């Protein structure tokens, strides 16, 4: 009896609605899997159309073209003699489902609809699909005529069903189902399913890989079995980067690990595993076997096909591997760089334009581009023909082969230091040195003539000329003068992005990169329509703390010594007059809180779902050794006041790489109003009452505290009622 099976899973860089490209990548993955001896190939969730189609799922065209690609795959010689598992949307009885279609030798074996839809964070699957709610039940799906003519089948099983081959049994999960409390793999495993597959569309978040790996290893540790996970990779047209991490596990151990970040459009993993190892592993777990006797059976579709070969005694089996994780700063170096590469090559632009201020944030964006150039050179050196073709198209030179990241960076990145009378020589020097060290084409200019022209128009109309606070002006004048400088820089950035290559006799235009980090966006510490307004922002979902660690990594890994000077310099916007030639404006002083505090506020607000009062209560304990209750209250109230005043800025935020679960992205991740009562009277009164009670307790005797404890408190609503005249 054959026992050893070779199975394949993959990570594909699919692109929403790119049916031709998606078809070719699926076909290539099947060819590679067959070439490695696999007899089962698993692909990512919705791989035929690309996961990120969003409201295009409502269009009949998306369903039609997906069926056409399925027909092309069924008819392709490469898909013969291997069980293929592909993801696509399907309409059954006028209901749209997110499905896996499993086929072999021009016959569709079954269609498995998704049963638990992802509907939190960036996911909106319930907007487009309906979950299959009939556990362990199937219906007959009537095939469209184009598939009937090809397969000679009229109907196929549709529902919660497993596949029985001659030698084993295979069950399917789809992405979110692995993450649910009652995952299907549990009962499937108890019912004798030995191979579980999971087609995923799982995007990158810093530190998320640990959770994904833990879920897979735990699934096979408690119940035994083989587990295959496929995932999409790359930017498929939105803010998300799908980070691969395809894997094959058995009995709690990993046997094949895919890359998390790479420029390869097609990556196929295979492993040869012994089914008897699954059976003996399960046999020793008596509690599992007792539960198995009580489980309701799954309907089975049988197929006259085996994953193993009859004479496999000399076939070597795969060995367990230790999963290699990236540190968060390495994830920042790789994830946004791969995302930028996909965005650039698919956007038909000729490179990037980045306003370089000499500070940490814009330096981090520059380092992401430089990291991208390093990845491109490495991919070309390793023989990736697709990357070579893409870079040749970008530079408009068919014979070009990139070898040096600095030289490539000079072709793809234009940086610009936009000085004003409030800029220091130190930031100018740091920006210039960084541009030299990464090799970007660098421009230095002065915005003062444009600022004076704008203010001249205002003065001509009103007869007034605003002044900075340092020169006796009001806070309104001071803020307006800062914003004029910031917005002029945005206008100039787009002008130079459109015409700088034209001025140098080169073709094309540039994408403008932004550099606002997630903490400053959360607080609104940016000017609306300044250089935070760009085409895309590679660091917009990353905290200042993580960015500093990333820049430190780049200083060491890429040998960029100027980054040490940038890290040690105080963070400043340089929008107010210098004091004796020195910077007088500091970011953390302007904000009234530190970046570390901002990160904590951000996680509590979004991840812990804390409003003002809940946040105050949590921070009382977290900060009890460094802050009094009154100080905690003031910090919380200051944060929520500024956050709510500036929330409107999030509605126009530049599309940014999603990296943190506390992102304030208003587009689809953090859906909240942008018109608040910024005084928060009820919430802040609750906080103030608690502060008063806590301060009173510290000054009371034990007897007074006991009396206070049994005293009837005054309801907060009474304190908010208008007082009698």
From Swiss-Prot:
GO terms for cellular component: cytoplasm. It comes from the Eukaryota. Its EC number is 6.3.5.1. One of its GO terms (biological process) is 'de novo' NAD biosynthetic process from L-tryptophan. One of its GO terms (molecular function) is ATP binding. InterPro entries: C-N_Hydrolase, C-N_Hydrolase_sf, Gln-dep_NAD_synthase, NAD/GMP_synthase, NAD_synthase, Rossmann-like_a/b/a_fold. The keyword Glycoprotein does not apply. Gene3D superfamilies: Carbon-nitrogen hydrolase, HUPs. Disulfide bonds: none annotated. Residues 325-706 are annotated as: Ligase. The active site is at residues 45, 114, 175, 357. Residues 5-275 form the CN hydrolase domain. The keyword Nucleotide-binding applies. Keywords: ATP-binding, Ligase, NAD, Nucleotide-binding. SUPFAM superfamilies: Adenine nucleotide alpha hydrolases-like (SSF52402), Carbon-nitrogen hydrolase (SSF56317). It catalyses: deamido-NAD(+) + L-glutamine + ATP + H2O = L-glutamate + AMP + diphosphate + NAD(+) + H(+). ATP binds at residues 355-362. Catalyzes the final step of the nicotinamide adenine dinucleotide (NAD) de novo synthesis pathway, the ATP-dependent amidation of deamido-NAD using L-glutamine as a nitrogen source. In the C-terminal section; belongs to the NAD synthetase family. This is Glutamine-dependent NAD(+) synthetase. The gene is Nadsyn1.
């Amino acid at each position: 009896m054959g026992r050893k099976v070779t199975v394949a899973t993959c990570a594909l860089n699919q692109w929403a609605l790119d049916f031709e490209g998606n078809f070719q990548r699926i076909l290539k993955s099947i060819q590679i899997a067959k070439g490695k001896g696999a007899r089962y190939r698993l692909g990512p969730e919705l791989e035929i159309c690309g996961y990120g189609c969003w409201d295009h799922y409502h269009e009949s065209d998306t369903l039609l073209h997906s069926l056409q690609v399925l027909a092309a795959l069924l008819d392709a010689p490469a898909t013969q003699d291997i069980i293929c598992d592909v993801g696509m949307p399907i309409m059954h009885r006028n209901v749209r489902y997110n499905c896996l279609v499993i086929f072999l030798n021009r016959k569709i074996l079954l269609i498995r609809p998704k049963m638990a839809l992802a509907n939190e964070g960036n996911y909106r699957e319930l907007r487009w699909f309906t979950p299959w709610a009939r556990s362990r039940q199937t219906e007959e799906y009537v095939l469209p005529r184009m598939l009937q003519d090809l397969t000679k089948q009229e109907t196929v099983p549709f529902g919660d069903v497993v596949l029985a081959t001659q030698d084993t049994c295979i069950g399917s999960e789809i992405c979110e189902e692995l993450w649910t409390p009652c995952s299907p793999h549990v009962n499937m495993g108890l019912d004798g399913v030995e191979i579980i597959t999971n087609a995923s569309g799982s995007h990158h978040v810093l530190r998320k890989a640990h959770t994904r790996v833990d879920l897979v290893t735990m699934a096979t540790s408690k119940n035994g079995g083989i587990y295959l996970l496929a995932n999409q990779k790359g930017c498929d047209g939105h803010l998300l980067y799908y980070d691969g991490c395809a894997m094959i596990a058995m009995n709690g151990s990993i046997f094949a690990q895919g890359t998390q970040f790479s420029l390869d459009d097609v990556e196929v993993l295979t492993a040869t595993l012994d089914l008897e190892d699954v059976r003996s592993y399960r046999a020793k777990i008596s509690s599992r076997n007792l539960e198995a006797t009580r489980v309701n059976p799954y309907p089975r579709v049988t197929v006259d096909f085996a994953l193993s070969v009859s004479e496999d005694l000399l076939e070597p089996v795969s060995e367990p591997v230790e999963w290699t994780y990236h540190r968060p700063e390495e994830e920042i170096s790789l994830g946004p760089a791969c995302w930028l590469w996909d965005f650039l090559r698919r956007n038909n632009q000729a490179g990037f334009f980045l306003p370089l201020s000499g500070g940490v944030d814009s330096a981090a964006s520059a380092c992401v581009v430089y990291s991208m150039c390093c990845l491109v050179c490495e991919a070309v050196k390793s023989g990736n023909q697709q990357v070579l073709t893409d870079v040749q198209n970008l530079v408009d030179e068919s014979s070009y082969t990139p070898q040096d990241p600095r030289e490539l960076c000079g072709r793809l990145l234009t940086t610009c230091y936009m000085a004003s009378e409030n800029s220091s020589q130190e930031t100018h020097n740091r920006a210039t040195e960084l541009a030299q060290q990464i090799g970007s084409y660098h421009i230095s200019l002065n915005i003062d003539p444009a600022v004076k022209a704008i203010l001249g128009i205002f003065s001509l109309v009103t007869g007034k000329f605003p002044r900075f606070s340092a020169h006796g002006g009001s806070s309104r004048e001071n803020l307006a003068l800062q914003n004029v400088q910031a917005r002029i820089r945005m206008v100039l950035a787009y002008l130079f992005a459109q015409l700088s290559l034209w001025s140098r006799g080169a073709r094309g235009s540039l994408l403008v990169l932004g550099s606002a980090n997630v903490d400053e966006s959360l607080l609104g510490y940016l000017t609306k329509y300044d250089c935070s307004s760009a085409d895309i922002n590679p660091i917009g979902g990353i905290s200042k703390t993580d960015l500093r660690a990333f820049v430190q990594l780049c200083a060491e890994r890429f040998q960029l010594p100027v980054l040490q000077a940038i890290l040690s310099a105080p963070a400043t916007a340089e929008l107010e007059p210098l004091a004796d030639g020195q910077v007088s404006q500091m970011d953390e002083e302007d904000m009234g809180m530190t970046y570390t505090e901002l990160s904590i506020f951000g996680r509590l607000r979004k991840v812990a779902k804390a409003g003002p009062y809940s946040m105050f209560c949590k921070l009382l304990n977290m900060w009890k050794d460094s802050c009094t209750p009154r100080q905690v209250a003031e910090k919380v109230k200051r944060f929520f006041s500024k956050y709510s005043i500036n929330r409107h800025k999030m509605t126009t935020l530049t599309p940014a790489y999603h990296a943190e679960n506390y992102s304030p992205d208003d587009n689809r991740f953090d859906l909240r109003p942008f018109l608040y009562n910024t005084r928060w009277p009820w919430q802040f009164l609750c906080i103030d009452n608690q502060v008063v009670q806590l301060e009173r307790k510290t000054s009371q005797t034990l007897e007074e505290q006991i009396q206070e404890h049994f005293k009837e408190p005054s309801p907060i609503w009474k304190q908010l009622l208008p007082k009698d005249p």
